[in-house]
Amino acid sequence: SGFGIVPLNIMPHYLAYLTAYEQTKEILESYEEETGRKICTINDGDGIIISQAGKKGRYIKDERYTPIVAPGMSEYQAYFFDLYGTLIDIHTEEGDHELWEFMAKYYAYKGAKYGSWELRWRYGALIHDEEERLLHENPKQIPEPQVERVFMRLYEEKGVRVSIQEAVDAAQVFRSFSLRYVRLYYGAKELLAHLKKKGKKLYVLSNAQQVFTASELRYLGIYDYFDKVCLSSDYHCKKPDAAYFKALLTSEGLDPTKVMMIGNSEYDDIRTAKSLGMGACYIHSNLSPEGETANCDIVMRAMDLPSLEKILCREAHLA
């Protein structure tokens, strides 16, 4: 069917199992030939945007989800991409009791003995404590802790001294066990490759943890498309904080009017970008708030990166 569990050593001291789904027409057609079943959609988002139209191999667009493009849209020289819900589809289960039972055993091996419920409670409390610490240091910013500090403090609370690498390992084990799948949306690589070929500068601006996301970008094969990867944990603040946007604009010497923000959250991505004079593209994906939309240069009313590629890569003709 195209789904599979892929074993991959992407982090030290454990085997991560990441779900991969290769969304290609060839796989769908092969599946139809082998099973005799018709595929009605290859979209995981809120709306069916590509569907089988009766005749084998013929795919049509649903007009309800046609992209909206503002007239006279400027040509942009650089793009800031959100990750999860924009380029990457992900599902984690951090509330799973089996996760916390496993992590309690993991900590016990290092001499830090927790019950599963105690560990879960202390984890949440320490996340909040780290946010309060950062807020006290800079009251004007929206705080984003580094999760490895939390896992370090969980050891320290039980009187166990570990290295920062051991805290990072614990964080990555936590991520791998809670992860149900992480995969690219259909057309993500092609979009990045085409923009790169046109000489555009590509950046990540995402609310994410360095200890999780850098490895996931490499696993998915898109890390090297970006000129710079900015993750909120490295900046101790997160979107929609304008300081986070400005940090990347300033460090790269970018003119905001020549940069487009592409994301799936009107609140986190679009509002601040527009307030700074940037262009903006909103994508309503399966991870966007239900019923949300936006008023910006491009509105993708469903996840459809191939159509976005066509829009962006001929943008000079739209201006």
Show where each model-derived region lies.
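Short, flexible loop segments at the rims of nucleotide/cofactor-binding pockets, characterized by
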Residues: 17-18, 178-182, 207-208, 237
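Active-site neighborhood of HAD-like aspartate-dependent phosphohydrolases
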Residues: 66-122
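Short, flexible/disordered intra-domain loops and linkers
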Residues: 17-22, 91-98, 136-143
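Short, acidic loop-to-helix structural element flanking the phosphoryl-transfer center
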Residues: 142-149, 176-203, 214
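A metal-dependent, Asp-based hydrolase signature
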Residues: 104, 117-173
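C-terminal and late-domain segments of enzyme folds
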Residues: 2-68
